[in-house]
């Protein structure tokens, strides 16, 4: 071979390798090579490293190697070059037999990283096997009387090669008496027959030698031969013959074993042993047929030996022969074609082709949710199948070409039925009919078609004030009949505002479990009831929601100590109150007035005298009214200056308290001359320029105040005209314009120009959204008092007590001017126990639960005068409301007057010496018939 031949061969190998790689990548994605069987050891199969794209420098580090020892038996892999070569000769027939495809798997392992590559090596068939016959020689005896055209079957040759390398055709050595005829069987294999062309003559030639050659289709072709010796017999020159060379017979499947299929009947005209026949299967009868049928050699009867199944094979072919006993024996051949009849012995089958599972509950009626195929291995009517569905289901079966459809026939509702058990019944048309059941569980998937619903339309929660943030209020619960995300609920506070602030700043709702927590510390004095809207939303698409109301009631705690209004704390060093030494026992000295911002029992106040007083036995204090009276007559040796310390305690648990200190000066005065309100005022010094300036400023401020108050009175009258309050009253509810509230009270004393007390105004700023103003008015012409309720006022931060003229309020536009003592109100009546008595009828013992207030006229006037004097000298203020004369009243949503004595026992009406008694039907502040006195609203109407 020349030097140019090697590069050409190398180039061809490279082209073959590239073609192999392309085919490998396109077909299976794995490395695939082919090699011819019986290749010499060392024959290159392919370069694995090159095909994997590995660099030659990386082969050592990657340690390319075969994955198993079994692979190394036939192949070797070069670590240096990555070439896969044949290790030993491979015999395809021993590995794969007669299979048309022979693939030998090889595993290749690389390291760093560890990879496993599957390589398939196809072993190509090599025509290395020649056709061969079962015996090298065959002796055939043919009578000389054999007719021309007689056919004699010959043995077929066998070739283990496959494809074109197997037996392709036969040839017969030339002979004038015989020729070769080759038939093709159903499996495509050639079948040789020896044909007698002309009659034999034993005398001319007693033996004929024929060579039968079988040639395969390989390149180069291989062949095999057998020697056929034909012996010509002189006698028995008639061979057995059948009525027909092809016999057709039918038998039903599942025929019992032993059933007679056919009785062969061949004839031989010879006599004697030459005419005695033996029957047997021909050489071309398959082993399967021999297992199913049996042939009686003497009678020729064919019986069933095994199970006949139409589905296994509908047709059988039996080759039979009849041989006489002549010398030589003669044979006759026939073919029995057995047709198997179908019996309905196979139940139909239902095959699920497609099923939408689960099915949306919103699926429209008529939607296909499943496809089914049916089949029956039987034939004819035995193979005709119908499919039915169980009744009372919202589904129906619709037949189509080659399949059945499962459709919805009614609307679906998952909340009513979450799944359906569907029974499908397949039946064939055979007799008897066979059936097959198929059970399907069809789930219904949820659609968000149900809104969540709260278990309650209204939830109520209670919480004590001052509880820390995060306190659990209650738990709201909702349910949703949907499932999954459609039933996954999220709770929230619906965006509304409370007192100008978002509701979410007051409470927090756990979005997962609906627990409601306080976001802040609640103050009962600021807020008594909170209305919240809680919403719930599911997680469906689109989401559905629902709302419920939550009322949170804040419960009062005793967190406010009593606030002393009179005497005002810090005024201990102001001008003391004067008390004549001639005052009889039981005389009203002063009155301690206090209020409590709490409610209910926490606001019930009691008064007691502390031992720190100068002379504890000299004075008595009323437990419920705070009135300080003399316990005995004053003596000469009593100290001229008396300090009375009064303890004010509420009824809470634990109770809170405050103290009030009253300074008294004992004076020697004529007991007939009772002090006036003006006597308690300090006389101003002589007028100076400063006084003039003050008068001018007072006039200016008074004018401005008059204009302002006139405007406010007009608005008040407009509100009364709209139906809020009675005709002469100015007491109504008003929302606070500011969210800031104060828990203080500001007393405001208004005096006349002569120094006498005109009226006293106490503005209470409770901690909710309303203000209450209570005014005690004193007529300048009498020692009585007018007690009125003004409408709620929105005032600024309470300041110090105002005695300047600019603090005077005009009542001309809101209340009718009173120029004289008002007559007693006809809607207040005396009870029998309240009729006035003589002086000193008041019992000084305050150990009872509440004072009975049975005062005579003189004692009542003395109390009113003392109250006016206390306010006039600036040493005290009087708390308004129902506790103007000392009773602490709390008007809140949870405070009822049923728990305490009637507050009107401490309210004094001008022109009367008795306490108030409610007349039926007058609690709403309506004008009484025939009366024009001052009117007062019931405590039920005086809510904050």
From Swiss-Prot:
Compartments, record wording: Cell membrane
Domain Cadherin: 30-133, 134-242, 243-350, 351-454, 455-564, 571-677
Signal peptide span: 1-29
Glycosylation sites: 265, 443, 547
Keyword Transmembrane helix carried by entry: yes
Domain of life of the source: Eukaryota
CDD domains: Cadherin_repeat
Gene3D superfamilies: Cadherins
Cytoplasmic side: 715-944
Keywords linked to the UniProt accession: Calcium, Cell adhesion, Cell membrane, Glycoprotein, Membrane, Repeat, Signal, Transmembrane, Transmembrane helix
Membrane topology designation: Single-pass type I membrane protein
Ranges annotated as biased composition (Polar residues): 820-853
Transmembrane stretches, start-end: 694-714
Renumbered residue ranges of the record's region Disordered: 722-747, 812-853, 914-944
GO molecular function, one term: calcium ion binding
Major location category of this protein: membrane
Annotated GO biological process: homophilic cell adhesion via plasma membrane adhesion molecules; negative regulation of neuron apoptotic process; nervous system development; synapse organization
Basic residues bias spans: 934-944
General function of this protein: Potential calcium-dependent cell-adhesion protein. May be involved in the establishment and maintenance of specific neuronal connections in the brain.
Cross-referenced PANTHER family: CADHERIN-87A (PTHR24028), PROTOCADHERIN GAMMA-C5 (PTHR24028:SF349)
This protein's name: Protocadherin gamma-C5
Organism: Pan troglodytes
Gene this protein is translated from: PCDHGC5
